[in-house]
Regions:
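N-terminal signal peptide c-region/cleavage motif recognized by signal peptidases
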Residues: 13-15
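Beta-sheet-dominated interaction scaffolds and their linkers
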Residues: 19-54, 93-94, 161-178
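Surface-exposed binding patches on compact interaction domains or structured appendages
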Residues: 22-26, 51-105, 192-195, 199-204
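Beta-strand-rich interaction surfaces with strong enrichment in secreted/lumenal proteins
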Residues: 30-33, 90-96, 210-215, 227-229
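Short Pro-Gly-centered flexible turn/kink motifs
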Residues: 40-42, 94-107, 217-226
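Buried hydrophobic-core signal for structured, non-transmembrane domains
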Residues: 42-48, 99, 106-108, 121-125, ...
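Short solvent-exposed strand-capping/beta-turn motif centered on an Asx-Ser/Thr pair
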Residues: 47-52, 63, 182-188, 245
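Terminal connector regions
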Residues: 52-66, 109-152, 232-258
Length: 258
């Protein structure tokens, strides 16, 4: 499974030998849709991929985004949409032997009276090698932090779904066209898109799927990319139809000249 790693802090130099390093082997985004008052177990699979023992530390944080700033991890409970205090890990600190694997169970307890459409938090998993590198020679001194996002959707409250097109880049010598969206709603969504290109007679002369589906939390901006077609020069109408993982659809149109 291909993982998208949020590497928050990395310091490294060359080393002739391997050290301990704990990595997250499970997904980095967990979407939960349970009724208020219910519970859910989030399993976090960890593995020490190094040849020496390695410790890890789990820390709770809030999760937010402000368009181009990317993810932010403020202190737990500091944002309005926080569910950090719903989460409890069975352990927060542990040492794994070389190549040892472990599943840490994180319990989510959803309050009975919760009446918002969504909430979110983050588990920051930091790998801390047990032994310091030899100070006399080249060093490998790595501290990796993985951000495991926990995204809750309340099935009892209708969400506000609003994806705003911020920019469309179709010119230049780029091999792809890029459409930038911002999630202006109040719930996370995964979007996939299909682009249709119509000529001046209204005929569809090209259509393609977006290269990758994109997940967006509220206020986050993501770019959807399409392979650029090889078409004759002329006037065209581009129609992009997008769909969320919950089935909502929305579209964008744009006139362009090739």
């Amino acid at each position: 499974m291909k993982l998208l790693l949020h590497l928050l802090a990395v310091a490294l130099s060359v080393s002739p030998y391997a050290h301990g390093q704990v990595t997250v082997q499970s997904g980095l985004a967990h979407r939960i849709e349970r009724l208020p008052g219910q519970q859910e177990i989030v399993p976090i699979k960890l593995k020490n991929v190094g040849d020496q023992p390695c410790a890890f530390h789990i820390e709770l944080a809030d999760l937010s985004s402000h368009c181009d700033s990317g993810y932010r991890y403020p202190p737990p409970g500091s944002t309005d949409a926080s569910c950090a205090n719903w989460l409890e890990a069975e352990t927060y600190d542990h040492v794994l032997r070389a190549h040892e694997e472990m599943i840490v169970k994180v319990r989510m307890r959803i309050p009975k009276g919760f009446n918002e459409s969504s909430a979110r938090a983050c588990l920051l998993v930091t790998s801390k090698p047990e032994k310091e590198a030899d100070k006399k020679g080249p060093r490998l001194n790595i501290e990796l932090r993985y951000a495991v996002n926990v995204l809750y959707r309340n099935p009892m409250v209708p969400p506000v779904v609003a994806m705003e097109a911020k920019a469309l880049a179709v010119g230049g010598d780029n091999a792809v066209w890029a459409l930038r969206y911002q999630n202006a709603g109040n719930v996370d969504r995964i979007i996939s898109s299909r682009a249709h290109l119509l000529n001046d007679q209204g005929e569809v002369v090209y259509q393609t799927e977006s290269l990758h589906a994109k997940g967006l939390i509220p206020n986050q901006c993501r770019t959807v990319q399409f392979n650029k077609p090889d078409l004759p020069a002329g006037d065209y109408q581009m129609v992009v139809v997008s769909q969320t993982d919950a089935g909502e659809k929305f579209g964008v149109t744009h006139s362009l000249k090739l």
